[in-house]
């Protein structure tokens, strides 16, 4: 139970400190929207992607044409909550880094966001002191960051 309380608190601290730092230096950029969206939705989206991977594994490894796909459907709320609880701190870090760079909605920005997602995922794995977890969290963080960047970053003027 301890990490589920600690990670959202760390995410809140990262988001608030990052916003206060950036609001003074770049008031024209929507820092709050980018940081808040990444903090609140990044981990949950990662949990949703994990559920999708589990569903693909069930479908691919099913020996019969009648697939019992109720497992991923039952696991979806738990996965989103776990992803939101554990992944909110790396997602907040990614959101602060993207807001600091003042990125706009473009494919290059999505690639940069994916790179920051990889870095944040590796940091999350290192926090767990588990290198295989880093290898699992990195691509999930990259894909989650790229998807959110395509939706949240401001459009070019």
What kind of feature is each model-predicted range?
Residues 1-157:
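Juxtamembrane/disordered regions of integral membrane proteins
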């Amino acid at each position: 139970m301890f990490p589920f309380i600690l990670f959202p608190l760390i995410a809140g601290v990262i988001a608030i400190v990052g916003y206060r730092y950036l609001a003074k230096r770049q008031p024209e950029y929507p820092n709050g929207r980018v940081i808040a969206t990444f903090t609140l939705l990044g981990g949950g989206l990662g949990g949703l992607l994990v559920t999708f991977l589990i569903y693909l594994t069930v479908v691919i490894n099913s020996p019969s044409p009648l697939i019992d796909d109720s497992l991923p459907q039952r696991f979806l709320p738990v996965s989103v909550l776990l992803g939101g609880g554990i992944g909110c701190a790396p997602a907040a870090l990614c959101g602060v880094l993207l807001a600091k760079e003042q990125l706009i909605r473009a494919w290059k920005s999505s690639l940069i966001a994916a790179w920051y997602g990889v870095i944040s995922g590796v940091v999350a794995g290192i926090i767990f002191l588990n290198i295989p977890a880093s290898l699992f969290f990195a691509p999930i963080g990259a894909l989650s960051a790229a998807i959110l960047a395509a939706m949240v970053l401001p459009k070019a003027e």
